[in-house]
Amino acid sequence: MVQSERYLIYIDKYIFIGKYKGKKNMFCVFTQAQEYDEDAKLWFKLGTIYLNNDKILSVKNVKGLKEYKKIIFP
């Protein structure tokens, strides 16, 4: 289970990005267990991305994120 601020960006049906508390350039990529329970508040961490001026520096342990070439953060 991942604790994160409610700074979520919807990428596709089940994949979101959330900001780590207190970490400026570090975001975690995770999925919600909607396929099991629509009301579930369970999140499974898929990996971490590191940003600098909204440019992705590196992606660690994120499967299926290669097709998302540009991720815009509010």
Locate each region found by the language model.
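Conserved RNA-binding domains used in RNP assembly and mRNA/RNA metabolism
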Residues: 1-74
